[in-house]
UniProtKB/Swiss-Prot annotation:
GO terms for cellular component: cytosol. This is 6-phospho-beta-galactosidase. It comes from Streptococcus agalactiae serotype III (strain NEM316). Keywords: Glycosidase, Hydrolase. Gene3D superfamilies: Glycosidases (3.20.20.80). GO terms for molecular function: 6-phospho-beta-galactosidase activity; beta-glucosidase activity. The active site is at residues 160, 375.
Length: 468
């Protein structure tokens, strides 16, 4: 049976400042840790990215033409405060005013994120969110933006607190490139959640008219053998690292007994301890019912198997299928079942996982209010022919995920919109320019945009709300 979505559903496209803007040192922008880290460790940099800094009128005109009525944008913190605090860079402020004005002119509602992986270098080198001083700097930056940009109706504090801790301190593919430090992972999660809570409370206390939430990446975790209690435990522990710890902080205002028991077990196996303070929990408690919405980024699920050995993680950054490895001491290892398809980057394609995660949020955290799917899409080595890309695989991927959204809505979940990652091709943090996600193909040499087959398909779905 053909599935449909509600008439008021937002069909959006997602971007991020550092992945799209380029212009990394233009008009007074301060450095971020990624600038040097990419030069030192990867085969690409964030120049020119998609040159969104100059090309945003083109991208927003395409959005309007192709029925995209929402856009995720992030503000580059170091465009506003080049060192993270102190003097304001007025040219950066002016850029975002012009960008938001263009969004509204094109009837594309901006959903604006304050932090999308790009802490200013001065604060990053000072410990990033492991340093509690930077909680204060973030809250002050948020306060400035809330006051300066009243034209923004939808704010999110952070994009993917989980993958930030994961990328920086577990996998080590984000600066500062530390591996296997689980205590730092959890401390980063916690301190960022405290930062989120304080910013949300401030927003509500000031009585601003818009809405505010947070974007979490929530990959669903399953036991490889549901009948094997050790596999079930491995999936539970992996879920605590990536999902439950953060969701508890967001919606309970504390960490449940089960969550903390898992954290203690993981740290007993891997070393380290956490600094969790009473005032932190006061901040979390004060904000737990103030979130207007939850953004869920969902690309994949994982299957976990019990494992007795040392931690080893190999990141597949070049799309060499089968080259990744993930096993954590005292937790488990990822083993993909044969029946699930995978991308060249070993990401497991499993739309049912999105349904299961939405229903988990609905059932376990009933104060969630509403959900937007803030990222979902398929990374591909797109073939550019006839001035387009015949990306049937991407269409199929998005179609399947929209269908499970329709099912979740039918089953009582309040899902209000979907943002495809990404609106146009952007650069990928740890994969470069080869891994493309956009509805619009970007020739990174000329910065020309070309609609892919998926753009035409998405336009039709947005117009009719019928998924076919």
């Amino acid at each position: 049976m053909t599935k449909t979505l509600p008439k008021d559903f937002i069909f959006g496209g997602a971007t991020a400042a550092y992945q799209a803007e380029g212009a990394t040192h233009t008009d007074g922008k301060g450095p971020v840790a990624w600038d040097k880290y990419l030069e030192d460790n990867y085969w690409y940099t964030a120049e020119p990215a998609s040159d969104f800094y100059h090309k945003y009128p083109v991208d927003l005109a395409l959005a309007e033409e192709y029925g995209v009525n929402g856009i995720r944008i992030s503000i580059a913190w170091s465009r506003i405060f080049p060192t993270g605090y102190g003097e304001v860079n007025l040219k950066g402020v002016e850029f975002y005013h012009k960008l938001f004005e263009e969004c509204h002119k094109r009837h594309v509602e901006p959903f604006v994120t304050l932090h999308h992986f790009d802490t200013p270098e001065a604060l990053h080198s000072n410990g990033d969110f492991l340093n509690r001083d930077n909680i204060e700097h973030f809250v002050n930056y948020a306060a400035f933006c809330f006051e300066e940009f009243p034209e923004v109706n939808y704010w999110t504090t952070f994009n993917e607190i989980g993958p930030i801790g994961d990328g920086q301190y577990l996998v080590g593919k984000f600066p500062p490139g530390i591996q296997y430090d689980l205590a730092k992972v959890f401390q980063s999660h916690h301190n960022m959640m405290v930062s989120h809570a304080r910013a949300v409370k401030l927003y509500k206390d000031k009585g601003y008219k818009g809405e505010i939430g947070v974007v979490h990446a929530l990959p669903t975790k399953y036991p490889l053998d549901p009948e094997n209690s050790a596999d079930v435990r491995a999936a539970e522990l992996e879920d605590i690292i990536h999902n439950k710890f953060i969701l508890d902080a967001t919606y309970l205002g504390y960490y449940s007994e089960m969550t903390m028991a898992g954290v203690k077990h993981i740290l007993k196996e891997n070393g380290g301890e956490l600094d969790l303070r009473e005032e932190d929990f006061q901040a979390l408690e004060a904000a737990k019912d103030l979130n207007d919405f939850l953004g869920i980024n969902y690309y994949m699920s994982d299957w976990m198997q019990a494992f007795d050995g040392e931690t080893e993680i190999i990141h597949n950054g070049k799309g060499e299928k089968g080259s990744s490895k993930y096993q954590i001491k005292g937790v488990g290892r990822r083993v993909a079942p044969d029946y699930v398809p995978k991308t060249d980057w070993d990401w497991i394609i499993y739309p049912q996982g999105l349904y299961d995660q939405i229903m988990r949020v609905k059932n376990d955290y009933p104060n969630y209010k509403k959900i937007y799917i803030t990222e979902n899409g398929l990374g591909y080595k797109d073939e550019f022919v006839d001035n387009t890309v015949y990306d049937d695989g991407r269409i199929d991927y998005v179609k399947q995920h929209l269908e499970v959204l329709s099912e979740a809505i039918s089953d009582g979940a309040n899902v209000k919109g979907y943002f495809i990652w990404s609106l146009m091709d952007v650069f990928s943090w740890s994969n470069g320019y080869e891994k493309r996600y956009g509805l619009f193909y970007v020739d990174f040499e000329t910065q020309e945009r070309y609609p892919k087959k998926s753009a035409h398909w998405y336009k039709q779905v947005a117009k009719t709300q019928i998924i076919e």
